[in-house]
Curated annotation (Swiss-Prot):
Predominant subcellular localization, coarse grouping: endoplasmic reticulum
Cytoplasmic side, ranges: 42-392
Enzyme class, broadest EC rank: oxidoreductase
Transmembrane annotation, as ranges: 22-41
Keyword Transmembrane helix (UniProt): yes
Bilayer disposition of the protein: Single-pass membrane protein
Gene Ontology terms: cellular component: endoplasmic reticulum membrane
Protein name: ER-bound oxygenase mpaB
Organism field: Penicillium brevicompactum
Membrane topology, Lumenal segments: 1-21
Name of the encoding gene: mpaB
Length: 392
């Protein structure tokens, strides 16, 4: 005795040039075959990455270059796990507010603790990091973003207001948070190749920024590969949090403007009910991506910063969170889904606030380039044209 089909499927079956007994196996085959196909396609790209960047053994990964690490991480961030890479980076920034020495400095500067400056400062920070991770380490744009970041930190380092350990902790979060988020919430775990790329990239970026890793166990003798650095900085950052991430009024003062939801910032923990709801949603998302959602094509790679300048030779961000800093007021940006969400939440859309938060932004300057090697001052001031502020 066969089971009756639902009415909608019965109508569809009658409309097809097959009998019911012929159509049902096709439908069942599709239900079984489609998830298998999607899973195969998703893992196929991962296999292609391993062939393109061929490091057959753990020992061979010690030869991974900065450029190779950048390209591997870029594919992860823009094609494989774009949502978790972005979200983990935001949480990494928020998590630093749980360290009193960091939150005290931020509130003293007023950049993160006041509504009128917090979103601007957050956007500038995101833009600097975006320039470093979305452009090749040998590119002019990455070069100048590193130089500007070093300049912004230099005064505070010289005065002792920024601790070397706090800088390493911040660097560590941007390296390990994506790993933690992907391992817990994404449709697959990371391979040793990808872990090595993340460790190699951020260790190299830390060196370029003048952030020492000597405090780590292998810091003075040298790291075998990016994986070893990543593992050691992960353990060290957790120990650092256990020792220094304590409740402090300044933690919350900084986090209030960035909506950080950490217990160390003196916010209440979410109820078990809400935790269960979001855990369930994330588990469902994982299954949908693995078995139902085709892999993201290269044409739809997620990038938060324009790869080419506009007619005025300026670069713009491609998306925004609350206030549309450095967003071009195009028709799509003013009337697309993101604009409607912003409008419903009572936030401005691109173009509403004129030049203050519009396409031109701050003029910027070439400070931060002066401490680099002779002969490199002639580089185009790409980052200056991106208009990040230099006033901390």
């Amino acid at each position: 005795m066969s089971l009756p089909l639902p009415p909608a499927l019965s109508e569809l079956a009658r409309a097809l040039p097959y009998s019911r007994t012929q159509w049902l196996p096709i439908f069942v085959g599709f239900l079984i075959g489609y998830p298998i196909l999607i899973r195969a396609l998703r893992y196929k790209r991962h296999g292609e990455m391993k062939k393109k960047f061929y490091f057959p053994t753990r020992e061979s990964m010690a030869e991974m270059t900065d450029e190779e690490a950048f390209l591997i991480q870029k594919e992860m961030a823009q094609l494989e796990f774009p949502f978790m890479f972005l979200t983990s980076g935001q949480f990494a920034l928020f998590r630093t507010y749980g360290i009193p020495t960091i939150s005290h400095l931020l509130t003293k500067t007023g950049q993160f603790s006041k509504p009128e400056t917090s979103f601007k400062r957050y956007t500038d920070t995101a833009a600097l990091i975006g320039e470093m991770v979305e452009n090749s380490p040998t590119s002019q744009r990455a070069f100048i973003s590193v130089a500007r970041t070093r300049f912004l930190h230099s005064g505070y380092q010289a005065s002792g207001k920024i601790l070397d350990a706090d800088l390493l902790y911040t660097l560590a979060l941007f390296a390990v948070q994506p790993v933690r988020f992907i391992e817990n919430f994404e449709w697959r775990t990371l391979s040793d190749l990808e872990l090595c790329a993340i460790g190699t990239f951020w260790k190299s970026l830390g060196d370029a920024l003048g952030i020492s890793s000597e405090i780590l166990p292998s810091g003075k003798t040298g790291f075998k590969d990016g994986i070893q650095w990543l593992e050691e900085v992960d353990v060290w950052s957790q120990d650092y949090e256990a020792k220094y991430m304590v409740p402090d009024p300044k933690n919350r003062e900084s986090a209030d403007q960035a909506t950080a939801m950490l217990i160390s910032n003196r916010y209440e923990a979410p109820t078990p009910g809400w935790s269960m709801v979001f855990s369930t949603l994330l588990a469902i998302r994982k299954l949908i991506l693995r078995y139902l959602s085709p892999p993201r094509p290269a044409a739809l790679a997620v990038s938060n910063i324009a790869q080419k300048p506009d007619k005025d030779d300026r670069y713009h961000r491609m998306s925004w969170d609350a206030l549309p800093f450095y967003i071009r007021p195009t028709f799509w940006n003013r009337w697309g889904p993101m604009a409607w969400i912003s409008w419903l939440m009572g936030h401005p859309v691109p173009g509403d606030l004129g030049q203050k938060k519009g396409p031109q932004g701050d003029p910027g300057n070439d400070e931060g380039i002066k401490d680099l090697k002779d002969g490199e001052m002639s580089l185009p001031l790409v980052w200056s044209k991106y208009h990040a502020t230099t006033n901390d």
